[in-house]
UniProtKB/Swiss-Prot annotation:
Cofactor note: Divalent metal cations. Prefers magnesium or manganese.
PROSITE patterns the UniProt entry points to: MALIC_ENZYMES
Protein name (database record): NAD-dependent malic enzyme
SUPFAM superfamilies in UniProt: Aminoacid dehydrogenase-like, N-terminal domain, NAD(P)-binding Rossmann-fold domains
Reaction(s) the record says it catalyses: (S)-malate + NAD(+) = pyruvate + CO2 + NADH; oxaloacetate + H(+) = pyruvate + CO2
Residues flagged as site, Important for activity: D266
Cofactor: Mg(2+); Mn(2+)
Keyword hit for DNA damage: no
Family label: Belongs to the malic enzymes family.
Keyword Transport in annotation: no
InterPro entries (UniProt xref): Aminoacid_DH-like_N_sf, Malic_enzyme_CS, Malic_N_dom, Malic_N_dom_sf, Malic_NAD-bd, Malic_OxRdtase, NAD(P)-bd_dom_sf, NAD_malic_enz_proteobac
GO molecular function list: malate dehydrogenase (decarboxylating) (NAD+) activity; metal ion binding; NAD binding; oxaloacetate decarboxylase activity
Length: 560
């Protein structure tokens, strides 16, 4: 736990109350009120953080819509970050869907309408020659984790322009709530490169740069200016790319992953949590991942990232790469990806099926999802299409004909874009399918039996990766580190008692889970020579030292 010794600060009076990282509100002691010129600025009664949190929760429950609850929670975050995270800690299962998916999607769409206070940095293309100055202007100086987006592919909602800032803000809140990384170390950044969303361009309330998106060399040069400025300002930072369009996501990751410690959560984080969930689901039915035939609906960067991670895991279980690739089938709107197709994305090419391997298939119909499920005898189905309702009853019944307990993972966010609801899958499979989703869903029921729906959410993985990187002081994130995170999640899932239908442990244990994943990631970083060797005892000590808890510290006054 980060030390709880007194903190010496130069702020006083209203300036202190307006500093979210330091504000304690009604919890300032009598001595602090005198020392920091706060006497008379606060109600007389001195409260504990528990009392403040109880009031905040009472106020939260008074709102009826999730959007209003999100706005209220963001207001607390922007006025008192310690209280914000204490409230999350006390009610994490209820609050997480409000600060992140699914509610954050609506918040991104309405960002300019609900904007209250500044948070993070907005780096616009017209001001690209001032990036160094902008990074110096950040209110947080000792930044260790950055989440950056350009707002082009927000969840399943597409181009949201600067509204995409809601995602880095939400992600970093989870780095703290789940992974114990101090909010003082976290910085959300929005790269404002314009928007192609005409609705936003026509909206008089839109606060971003009103211009079509830049692309090509202009875009790449701008991102490079940003990356080089970050390297100068915080050379040891962990930078997470978030919600970039697939034509930019993979090239940016490949270009910069050896230049600074960075990863793309949509590609690598989604892959790690998906594979961890899949391994755990296979353990639920006493099988290995390498025994499965797997189909993906959606062959974008996220789906292909998961597929490549699955192939690596199959190889760890004893298959050759060629054998593993024959068991993974990618389906997009044009059907099954095969080596006869042209104009495929570079990251899709290694995942095509050879026409020679499927020459015995019945091709009298288009090789769409239903045909692939039937002819490839699919046992695991991933949904990463961002399109509602594409998992049909025919598809699920075909899965059930291939295996007694098919694994169905409709991962698209938000809930309005899910390929099938868990209740639909449960009904069509007559309670046989093992289901996990990308966003939270209520329990399903079938013939009087209730089944819990696990949320295959990146929040199970990326906070632990971040904590592990910081604890090990890693200089990069390898594929092996991501695989270690997946395996750790699966192993942890076996340890916890779970409700019927559940694959992953309850989210209320997320901090314990993140610590264990962080330890596995840090060990792998050392093994991969991306971090200096350290004893297990010292590594555990570092993890504890980096784990921030939402508690108020005593303040002592000092001068600038």
């Amino acid at each position: 736990m980060l030390n709880q010794r007194p903190l010496y600060i130069p702020f006083a009076g209203p300036a202190l109350l307006e500093t979210p990282l330091l504000n304690k509100g009604s919890a300032f002691s009598s001595e602090e009120r005198d020392s920091f010129n706060l006497t008379g600025l606060l109600p007389h009664n001195i409260e504990t953080i528990e009392e403040q949190s109880s009031r905040a929760y009472l106020q939260l429950r008074s709102f009826t819509s999730d959007m209003d609850k999100h706005i209220y929670l963001r207001n607390i975050q922007d006025t008192n970050e310690t209280l914000f995270h204490h409230l999350i800690e006390q009610h994490i299962e209820e609050v997480m869907p409000l600060i992140y998916t699914p509610t954050v999607g609506q918040a991104c769409e309405k960002f300019s309408q609900i904007y209250r206070r500044k948070r993070g940095l907005f780096i616009s293309y017209p001001e690209r020659h001032k990036i160094d100055d902008m990074l110096q202007n950040a209110t947080k100086q000792n930044v260790k984790v950055i989440v950056v987006t350009d707002g082009e592919r927000i969840l399943g909602l597409g181009d949201q322009g600067i509204g995409g800032m809601g995602i880095p803000i939400g992600k970093l809140a989870l780095y703290t709530a789940c992974g114990g990384i101090s909010p003082a170390y976290c910085l959300p950044i929005l790269l404002d490169v314009g928007t192609n969303n005409q609705q936003l361009l026509d909206d008089p309330m839109y606060m971003g740069w009103r211009n079509p998106r830049i692309s090509g060399d202009e875009y790449n040069e701008f991102v490079d200016l940003f990356i080089q400025a970050v390297k100068r300002r915080w050379p040891e930072v962990l930078l997470q790319f978030e919600d970039f369009a697939q034509e930019n996501a993979t090239p940016l990751l490949n270009k910069y992953r050896d230049q600074l410690c960075c990863f793309n959560d949509d590609i690598q984080g989604t892959a790690a949590v998906s594979v961890g969930t899949l391994i755990a689901a296979c353990l639920n039915k006493s099988q290995k991942l390498s025994q499965q035939n797997i189909a993906f609906l959606g062959a974008g960067s996220a789906g292909c990232g998961i597929a490549e991670h699955i192939i690596r895991q199959m190889q760890r279980e004893g298959l050759t790469e060629e054998q593993a690739r024959r068991q993974v089938f990618m389906v997009d709107r044009y059907g099954l990806l095969t080596d006869s197709m042209t104009e495929l994305q570079k990251f899709q090419t290694p995942l095509v099926q050879k026409e020679s391997d499927i020459e015995h298939w019945d091709k009298s119909q288009k090789l769409g999802l239903a045909q692939v499920v039937k002819q490839a005898r699919i046992t695991v189905l991933f949904g990463v299409s961002g399109q509602k309702g594409l998992f049909t009853q025919e598809v699920v019944e075909a899965l059930c004909a291939n295996t007694e307990h098919p694994i169905v993972l409709p991962l698209s966010n938000p809930t309005s874009r899910v390929e099938a609801t868990p209740q639909e899958v449960t009904n069509w499979s007559r309670g046989k399918a093992i289901v996990a989703t990308g966003s939270p869903f209520p329990n399903t029921t079938f013939e009087g039996q209730s089944y819990e729906v696990s949320q295959c959410n990146n929040s199970y993985i990326f906070p632990g990766i971040g904590l592990g990187v910081l604890a090990a002081r890693a200089t990069g994130i390898s594929d092996n580190m991501l695989t270690a995170a997946s395996q750790a999640l699966a192993d942890i899932s076996v340890e916890y008692e779970k409700a019927p239908g559940a694959i992953l442990p309850p989210i209320k244990f997320i901090r314990e889970i993140s610590e264990k994943i962080a330890y596995a990631v840090a060990l792998q970083a050392i093994e991969d020579k991306l971090a200096l060797p350290v004893t297990a005892e010292n590594l555990e000590r570092r993890l504890k030292a980096n784990f921030w808890l939402p508690k108020y510290r005593d303040y002592r006054r000092t001068s600038f």
